[in-house]
Amino acid sequence: MKKIVFEKRDLSTEDSEAIANALMKGEIPEIQVSALLTSLAMKGESFEEIVGFARAMRNNAIKISYPEALDTAGTGGDGLGTINVSTITAIILSQLFPVAKHGNRSVSGKSGSADVLEALGYNINIAPELANKLIKENNFVFLFAQIYHPAMKNVANVRKTLGIRTIFNLLGPLTNPAGTRYQLIGLFSSKVMDIVAKAASLLDYKKVFIYHGEPGIDEISPYGYTTVYEITNGKIQQYRLHYSDFGLKRQIPIEKITATSANESAIKILRGVMGIDSDIRDFIGINVAVGLKLIGKAEDARDGFEYAMQLMESTIQHLRRIIESNGDIKKFDQLVRQVGKG
């Protein structure tokens, strides 16, 4: 720890993993944890440190084994309050590919993936033995971070007291308890893209897309350009996508795709997939399109967007089956009726 706190030097992957293991076992006093996390944030986390911490979090997680699945967990934290597009993207893609959606409560907007799924009627408190059953039944399961990463309770108080972004804000997407080897990762800042991409290239993934969109969202942007890092079997390729690459002929202002609560996010998501709100529909569509390319179901952005539009036609029925298996179907049906009337 002296290397970081006093000398501001990067830790090796091995040292980072050892320190993170000690943190999660509660072996380091809170005052030292606070100094460590603050020093890492001030110095800037290296990709070796992210790899080490991610491996420790994975080792300390309650695991389910479904490595050939996809996750769409982003970091959140962009502060712009967009609807939870990564969650509906996961649900739409699960019509074609198994998805183990790892998530938590809100970081950036008014609702995280856990919040919006609850608003739709889904039960987020899923034990590991049930998780395996659900993903086999419907190709989709939600893995609530608070259940599957119990060791994180040992740093929760310090993180809350500090009130700043720490290395743990980058780790959620890299620590899926199912060991998913396919991943869509939206980042809150373009400044961390290089280090997260390098870290992901060292973490046993088959294919990962990492992106950050204008004007500063952790999603594919309907407003301007999105920078994408595509990682395939450890090799990194970088490029940019513009909303026009998907076939969109208009810019969608960010205020058209935001929500102030989990319930509003859920309603707007349903309005999008039901074709009632074209701005939300297209925002969802471009994010699904990138996921379709990742899983090999689309050649390019435009092809993916067209396929995403087709998939949305069956999404309500698919989502209904998911909630019927694990949730409050009456709540969901009522919400769908409300949206349809409105």
UniProtKB/Swiss-Prot annotation:
Keywords per UniProt: Amino-acid biosynthesis, Aromatic amino acid biosynthesis, Glycosyltransferase, Magnesium, Metal-binding, Transferase, Tryptophan biosynthesis
Mention any Pfam family matching this sequence.
Glycos_trans_3N
Q: Does the keyword Magnesium apply?
A: yes
Which reactions is this enzyme annotated as catalysing? N-(5-phospho-beta-D-ribosyl)anthranilate + diphosphate = 5-phospho-alpha-D-ribose 1-diphosphate + anthranilate
Q: Where does Mg(2+) 1 bind?
A: 86, 219
Q: Which residues bind 5-phospho-alpha-D-ribose 1-diphosphate?
A: 74, 77-78, 82, 84-87, 101-109, 113
Q: Which InterPro entries match?
A: Anthranilate_Pribosyl_Tfrase, Glycosyl_Trfase_fam3, Glycosyl_Trfase_fam3_N_dom, Glycosyl_Trfase_fam3_N_dom_sf, Nuc_phospho_transferase
Instruction: Explain how, and how many, cofactor molecules are bound.
Output: Binds 2 magnesium ions per monomer.
Q: Does the keyword Transmembrane helix apply?
A: no
Q: How does it assemble?
A: Homodimer.
What is the name listed in the Swiss-Prot or TrEMBL entry for this protein? Anthranilate phosphoribosyltransferase
Organism annotation: Sulfolobus acidocaldarius (strain ATCC 33909 / DSM 639 / JCM 8929 / NBRC 15157 / NCIMB 11770)
